[in-house]
């Protein structure tokens, strides 16, 4: 292979070059994967996430020093009776080297995605988000000047801020929930020049998140026995599985895939219900009855994706099945108590979604799903908000447009976005 990497479709087995490709050209219902020329992980002398660029679908790098940070837990590990607990932290914690200024692991996705589009495609990225992903892409836009269109629920608008001004962001707020934002974002991409970020289909997003597994394995010198993360779409779980398979093929980190322990926040737990029923399909009326009311009641609303990549080839179901995985439904009270325990023992505050993962770890330890000497990886997907508020400037991203639930992307709304796009002076692929 002369190229750094190719894309592989697990449906038909075809290999092909990347042109910011999100789907198999033959129409397979499968998530494309990257196949890298380097089968052994080689570290680069580059900042942040880009030290792992040999296994990222990019050619260059950004001058952003933000990546995952792994360390051996003492306080939480002692509290839970675990002798080998590795925490990989993605957030703001300068004493530990954590420099994700938006306090979320979504920066691991945003950095390589923005770079990949610039290298392999053309146009302006569109991102639909419940808050954290949108904030991460706004931050990368602020630091690089890359224009982005971000669509979020109106209730999440206050989560959109950056640590330096972000003049190249078109923020659209939608009355409704995360799924309404996804639907409207899809319509925005009908405008020539606006490109969907791709979600789980985006290999840069998954491989960026996969650096959590790479960082932890390098720190511990081996793959973990068990991996804990809270999920909304489940893309992070897929990313962990894919990265672990690459590390197994590398040969230096062990031959056994980690068991995935993935969690959702009650009462919105469609993937938990489908998994416990042994179903590859999510049945909305069974797995997420009264979805809107359930979404309103969760503590971690970033975990409320109504259309996760569950049944697709290479999706969440396959990741759980391949690893002998387990899922957890975590109540709000348990989430809050887990967050307090982590802050008391590890001395940093958590994002609510990360607290869901901690709660699942507590349950697994109490119920014997993991052993005291097992090597455990806890993926802390966000935290350090209090410290960031003390140390960093914060610039709110003001909405460019506000739209009603169900409003069509037409007329004045479409014209406004077209006008913004014209001001960006970006290359638009014919």
From Swiss-Prot:
Binding positions for pyridoxal 5'-phosphate per the UniProt entry: 132, 381
Name listed for the protein in its UniProt record: Cysteate synthase
Tagged with keyword Transferase: yes
Gene Ontology molecular functions: cysteate synthase activity; pyridoxal phosphate binding
Co-factor requirement: pyridoxal 5'-phosphate
Pathway noted in the entry: Cofactor biosynthesis; coenzyme M biosynthesis
Superkingdom: Archaea
Gene source species: Methanoculleus marisnigri (strain ATCC 35101 / DSM 1498 / JR1)
The family this protein is said to belong to: Belongs to the threonine synthase family. Cysteate synthase subfamily.
Pfam short name (any one): PALP
Single GO biological process annotation from the record: coenzyme M biosynthetic process
Swiss-Prot/TrEMBL catalytic activity: O-phospho-L-serine + sulfite + H(+) = L-cysteate + phosphate
HAMAP family: Cya_synthase
Summary of subunit composition and partner proteins: Homotrimer.
């Amino acid at each position: 292979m002369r190229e750094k990497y190719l894309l592989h479709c697990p449906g038909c087995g075809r290999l092909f070059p990347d042109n910011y490709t999100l789907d198999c050209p033959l129409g397979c219902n499968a998530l494309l994967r990257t196949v890298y020329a380097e089968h052994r992980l080689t570290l680069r002398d580059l900042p942040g996430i880009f030290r792992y660029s040999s296994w990222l679908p990019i050619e260059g790098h950004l001058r952003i020093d933000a990546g995952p940070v792994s360390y051996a837990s003492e306080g939480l590990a002692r509290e839970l009776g675990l002798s080998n607990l590795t925490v990989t932290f993605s957030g703001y914690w300068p004493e530990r080297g954590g420099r994700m200024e938006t306090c979320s692991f979504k920066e691991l996705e945003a950095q390589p995605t923005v770079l990949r589009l610039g290298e392999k495609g053309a146009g302006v990225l569109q991102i639909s988000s419940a808050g954290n992903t949108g904030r991460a892409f706004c931050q990368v836009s602020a630091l690089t000047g890359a224009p982005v269109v971000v669509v979020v629920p109106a209730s999440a608008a206050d989560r959109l801020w950056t640590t330096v001004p972000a003049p190249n962001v078109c923020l659209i707020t939608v009355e409704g929930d995360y799924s309404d934002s996804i639907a409207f974002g899809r319509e925005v991409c009908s405008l020539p020049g606006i490109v969907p970020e791709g979600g789980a289909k985006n290999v840069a997003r998954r491989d960026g998140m996969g650096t959590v597994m790479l960082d932890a394995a390098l720190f511990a010198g081996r793959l973990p026995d068990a991996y804990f993360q809270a999920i909304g779409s489940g893309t992070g779980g897929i990313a962990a599985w894919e990265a672990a398979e690459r590390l197994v093929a590398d040969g230096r980190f062990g031959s056994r895939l980690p068991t995935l322990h993935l969690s959702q926040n009650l009462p919105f737990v469609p993937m938990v219900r489908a998994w416990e029923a042994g179903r590859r399909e999510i049945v909305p009326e069974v797995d997420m009855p009264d979805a809107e009311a359930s979404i309103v009641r969760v503590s971690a609303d970033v975990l409320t994706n109504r259309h996760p990549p569950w049944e697709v080839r290479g999706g969440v179901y396959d990741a759980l099945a391949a690893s002998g995985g387990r899922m957890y439904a975590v109540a709000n009270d348990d989430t809050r108590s887990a967050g307090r325990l982590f802050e008391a023992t590890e001395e940093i505050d958590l994002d609510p979604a990360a607290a869901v993962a901690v709660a699942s770890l507590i349950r697994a330890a109490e119920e014997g799903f993991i052993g005291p000497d097992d090597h455990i990886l806890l993926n802390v997907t966000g935290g350090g908000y209090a410290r960031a508020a003390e140390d960093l400037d914060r610039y709110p991203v003001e909405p460019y447009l506000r739209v009603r639930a169900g409003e069509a992307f037409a007329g004045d709304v479409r014209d406004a976005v077209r006008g913004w796009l014209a001001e960006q002076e970006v290359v638009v692929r014919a």
